[in-house]
C-alpha cells in the first residue's frame, strides 16, 4: 500500500524553498489493540463523573482548568486557549546547521520522513547530498497543532529524516540521579574492552530483532480463534438472565423441538414457547424450518487479518 502524506510543507533555507510532503516514519496500526468488554461481550463506554455531585458530565459542558494550588484552579475557555496557540504554517524555516552527532538522541521525539513534492526533486537532492558531505544536519522551526516545535533534518541513504526534538525542560538531567563514579583498574577495563570487541557488529540490523511479546499475543489470538473461543457482538442485547451463551442456544433448540409437536412455524410471526425469558423476539424472527439452526460454534472461525 502506498504511503499517505500527512502534510504538505515548504522547507526554507536562504533563498531556497523546497516543497516537500511529510510522512510518519512509524506504523502505529501494527500494534495489537484490545477492546474493553462487559461480561456479556458488549463494548463499554467511558463516562466522566463529577467528584462533587456524582453526576455524569458531558464532554461539551467541560472546562479546562490549571491547578495552581491544591483543589484551586484557574479556568480557561476554548477561545482563550485558541488565542494562545501558534498559528499553523506550512513553512519550515531552517535556522542553523550543526554537526549531526551533536544532538543527543535522548532529545529525539517523533520521527517523520520528508519527500520532494512537485518540482522539488533537485533542491531536495541538493540539500540531502550537501548535508551528507558536510556531516551536518539542519535545525528548523515548525508550527504545527498550535505549537512551535524544533526539528532536526538529517540525511539518510534514502532521503531526509524529519526528526521532532524535545525541548530542554522536557528531558530530565542524569545529574539528578546522583550516580557515583567508581574508579576501575586497568586490567578490569582491558577485560571489558575485550568483551565489547568480541560482541562488536558493523551496524544495527532492525530485522534481526522482533517483538517477542507481540508474537506471543498474536499466536494466542490465533489459538482462540481456531478454538472458537469467540464472543460475538450479535448477541450483546440478550438479557443476562438467559444464562451463558451455550446454555441459551441449548434452550433455543429445546424450544424449537417442543414447538414442532404443536404446529410448525407456518406463520413466521407466531410466538414459539418461551422456556427462557427474552427469547420471544429471537424465535419470532426465524423462518419456518424443519431443523435447528447451526450453533455459532460450528461456523468456520474468522481469520484474523494480519498486516
Curated annotation (Swiss-Prot):
It comes from the Bacteria. Residues 257-307 are annotated as: Disordered. InterPro entries: Ku70/Ku80_beta-barrel_dom (IPR006164), Prok_Ku (IPR009187), SPOC-like_C_dom_sf (IPR016194). Residues 11-179 form the Ku domain. Keywords: DNA damage, DNA recombination, DNA repair, DNA-binding. Residues 257-267, 290-307 have a biased composition (Low complexity). One of its GO terms (molecular function) is double-stranded DNA binding. SMART domains: Ku78. One of its GO terms (biological process) is DNA recombination. The keyword DNA-binding applies. The keyword DNA-binding applies. With LigD forms a non-homologous end joining (NHEJ) DNA repair enzyme, which repairs dsDNA breaks with reduced fidelity. Binds linear dsDNA with 5'- and 3'- overhangs but not closed circular dsDNA nor ssDNA. Recruits and stimulates the ligase activity of LigD. Belongs to the prokaryotic Ku family. NCBIfam families: Ku_bact. Homodimer. Interacts with LigD. This is Non-homologous end joining protein Ku. It comes from Paraburkholderia phymatum (strain DSM 17167 / CIP 108236 / LMG 21445 / STM815) (Burkholderia phymatum).
Amino acid at each position: 500500500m502506498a504511503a499517505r502524506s500527512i502534510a504538505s510543507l515548504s522547507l526554507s533555507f536562504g533563498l531556497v524553498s523546497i516543497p516537500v510532503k511529510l510522512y510518519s516514519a512509524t506504523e502505529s496500526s501494527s500494534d495489537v489493540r484490545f477492546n474493553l468488554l462487559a461480561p456479556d461481550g458488549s463494548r463499554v463506554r467511558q463516562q466522566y463523573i463529577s467528584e462533587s455531585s456524582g453526576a455524569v458530565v458531558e464532554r461539551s459542558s467541560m472546562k479546562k482548568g490549571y491547578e495552581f494550588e491544591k483543589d484551586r484552579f484557574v479556568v480557561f475557555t476554548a477561545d482563550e486557549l485558541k488565542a494562545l496557540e501558534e498559528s499553523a504554517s506550512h513553512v519550515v524555516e531552517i535556522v542553523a546547521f550543526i554537526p549531526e552527532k551533536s544532538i543527543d538522541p535522548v532529545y529525539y521525539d517523533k520521527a517523520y520522513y520528508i519527500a520532494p513534492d512537485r518540482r522539488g526533486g533537485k533542491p531536495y537532492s541538493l540539500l540531502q547530498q550537501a548535508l551528507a558531505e558536510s556531516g551536518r544536519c539542519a535545525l528548523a522551526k515548525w508550527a504545527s497543532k498550535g505549537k512551535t516545535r524544533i526539528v532536526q533534518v538529517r540525511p539518510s541513504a534514502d532521503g531526509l529524516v524529519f526528526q521532532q526534538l524535545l525541548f530542554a525542560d522536557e528531558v530530565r538531567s542524569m545529574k539528578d540521579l546522583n550516580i557515583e563514579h567508581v574508579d576501575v583498574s586497568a586490567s578490569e577495563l582491558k577485560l571489558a574492552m575485550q568483551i565489547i570487541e568480541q560482541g562488536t557488529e558493523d551496524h544495527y540490523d532492525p530485522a534481526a530483532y522482533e517483538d517477542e511479546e507481540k508474537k506471543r499475543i498474536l499466536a494466542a489470538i490465533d489459538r482462540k480463534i481456531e478454538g472458537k473461543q469467540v464472543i460475538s457482538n450479535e448477541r450483546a442485547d440478550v438479557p443476562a438472565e438467559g444464562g451463558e451463551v451455550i446454555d441459551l442456544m441449548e434452550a433455543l433448540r429445546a424450544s424449537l423441538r417442543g414447538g414442532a409437536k404443536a404446529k410448525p412455524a407456518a406463520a413466521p410471526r407466531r410466538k414459539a414457547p418461551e422456556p427462557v425469558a427474552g427469547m420471544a423476539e429471537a424465535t419470532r424472527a426465524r423462518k419456518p424450518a424443519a431443523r435447528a439452526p447451526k450453533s455459532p460454534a460450528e461456523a468456520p472461525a474468522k481469520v484474523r487479518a494480519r498486516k
